[in-house]
Swiss-Prot record:
UniProt region (Disordered), positions on chain: 1-51
Organism (species): Enterococcus faecalis (strain ATCC 700802 / V583)
The protein's name in its UniProt record: Large ribosomal subunit protein uL15
Any Gene Ontology biological process: translation
Highest taxon of source: Bacteria
Compositional bias ranges of the Basic and acidic residues kind: 1-10
Keyword Kinase: no
Length: 146
């Protein structure tokens, strides 16, 4: 096979259908838009969610919930990720960022108790779950809320 013998796979290339170019084309006159009406006009058509004047679904359904403006979003760190540090290390948000464990600190760091901690560490973070606090202290480490 040579370069000039290459051909696209059968049916992979189709010619664009040019509508409104004479009745003999099969897509002339109304150009696939049917007879008159809103959808036949240029720029015609109804807006998203419009149901012909009937109250649309999004307005028939009740509103639900709200967004709490006081919500704080914490960056989560689990115990098994803290195992990569050496014994006796002081783990701070800066150290976590440098290690690539946390990309965005958000409202602070919260330590959760997923996995097991085997190292003795001093962990400094904004929040700790109760079980994470117990696990860190059980491993001989200490916590500090900052």
């Amino acid at each position: 096979m040579k370069l000039h013998e290459l051909k696209p796979a059968e049916g992979s290339r189709q010619v664009r259908n040019r509508v409104g170019r004479g009745t003999s084309s099969g897509n002339g006159k109304t150009a696939g838009r049917g007879q008159k009406g809103q959808k036949a006009r240029s720029g015609g058509g109804v807006r998203l969610g419009f149901e012909g004047g009937q109250t649309p679904l999004f307005r028939r359904l009740p509103k639900r919930g709200f967004t709490n403006i006081n919500r704080k979003d914490y960056a989560v760190v689990n115990l098994d990720t803290l195992n990569r540090f050496e014994d006796g290390t002081e783990v701070t948000p800066v150290v976590l960022k440098e290690a690539g464990i946390v990309k965005n600190e958000k409202a602070g760091i919260k330590v959760l108790a997923d996995g097991e901690l085997t190292k003795k560490l001093t962990v400094k973070a904004a929040k700790f779950s109760k079980s994470a606090q117990e696990a860190i202290e059980a491993a001989g480490g200490s916590i500090e809320v900052i």
